[in-house]
């Protein structure tokens, strides 16, 4: 069907509806059970790494980093897990907080705490503000947008370009003190697979937002992946922000979901040590520790 429906007569529309309905019914009769979820590894990929399920088989192996990982404690995660993610992201181990299987949980927690308590440099919890705005490079990841939408944030669309978000527009929009943050997937951005250019990354790190608690949510989910050609690492966004005079502006997230087992991996929230100290005080009330056995 190449003709616009609005140009068809009522009779032609009825015929078209009957034809489409017949094709739809034929597909239903096939009884297909298709999982159309995007980003979900196949069984072959899961099987390739399933040996990790039997790595730990003796309680003696649960002694690591001077502690028994089966017990309570070590809210921010095992030092060895922090070191692993620091190597993957290019940041420092002390800038890493280790979470559970979903980095999305850490992202949600970050926004939630901004609303209930405010961030390190917030003048008030966001829930007390008249208006909270957020920059959403689009097209983008729907689960990111659902988080900010669920808090009633006014989301502002920023068009994507072949090199990342339209930075001229971003630099203009952040002059509004009500603009509190921006979602970013710097590598293989959903759904177009755009990779931010080095210039775009530097301009983002050098932003001068009017809001003192502007929050750059940097979802580096594909930090170790490369579709073609040699692996090209990104400059560490934490270092770039620090060098640009914005040490506390960014929270970076990643996980092993696309590396090992999505349902049983570990995640990381990387930020300045000042940011992590502030967040850990809030999270200490919420929990004692994530799954350290899995981290091991």
For the regions a language model picked out, list residue spans one by one.
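Conserved core of the PLP fold type I
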Residues: 61, 67-212, 223-245
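Hydrophobic "anchor" residues on beta-strands that sit immediately upstream
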Residues: 133, 215-216, 251
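Short acidic, S/G/P-rich loop/turn micro-motifs used as interaction or catalytic elements
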Residues: 42-45, 188-191, 260
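Short aromatic-enriched loop/helix-cap "lid" or pocket-rim segments at secondary-structure transitions
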Residues: 46-50, 147, 227-231, 263-266
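Conserved core segment of the aminotransferase class I/II
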Residues: 99, 238-296
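N-terminal "arm"/small-domain region of PLP-dependent enzymes with the aminotransferase-like
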Residues: 2-76, 80-81, 86-87
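Walker B catalytic acidic pair
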Residues: 220
């Amino acid at each position: 069907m190449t003709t616009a429906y609005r140009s068809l007569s009522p009779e032609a529309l009825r015929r078209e509806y009957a034809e489409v309905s017949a094709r739809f019914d034929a597909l239903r009769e096939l009884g297909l059970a298709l999982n159309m979820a995007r980003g979900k590894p196949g069984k072959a990929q899961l099987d390739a790494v399933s040996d990790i399920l039997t790595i730990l088989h003796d309680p003696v192996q649960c002694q690591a980093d001077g502690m028994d990982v089966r017990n309570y404690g070590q809210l921010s995660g095992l030092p060895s897990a922090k070191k692993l993610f620091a190597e993957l992201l290019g940041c420092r181990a002390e800038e890493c907080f280790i979470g559970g299987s979903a980095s999305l949980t850490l992202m949600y927690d970050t926004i939630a705490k901004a609303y209930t308590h405010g961030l390190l440099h917030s003048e008030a919890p966001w829930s007390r503000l008249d208006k909270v705005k957020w920059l959403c490079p689009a097209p983008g990841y729907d689960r990111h947008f659902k988080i900010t939408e669920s808090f009633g944030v006014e989301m502002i669309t920023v068009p994507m370009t072949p090199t990342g978000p339209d930075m001229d527009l971003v630099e203009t929009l952040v002059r509004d003190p009500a603009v509190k943050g921006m979602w970013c997937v710097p590598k293989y951005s959903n759904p177009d697979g755009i990779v931010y250019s080095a210039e775009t990354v530097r301009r983002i790190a050098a932003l001068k937002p009017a809001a003192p608690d502007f929050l750059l949510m940097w979802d580096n989910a594909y930090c170790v992946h490369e579709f073609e050609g040699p692996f090209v690492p990104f400059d560490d966004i934490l270092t770039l922000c620090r060098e640009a005079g914005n040490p506390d502006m960014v929270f970076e997230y990643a996980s092993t979901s696309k590396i090992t087992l999505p349902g049983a991996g570990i995640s990381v929230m990387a930020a300045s040590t000042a940011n992590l100290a502030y967040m850990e005080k809030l999270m200490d009330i919420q929990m004692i520790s994530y799954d350290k056995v899995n981290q091991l």
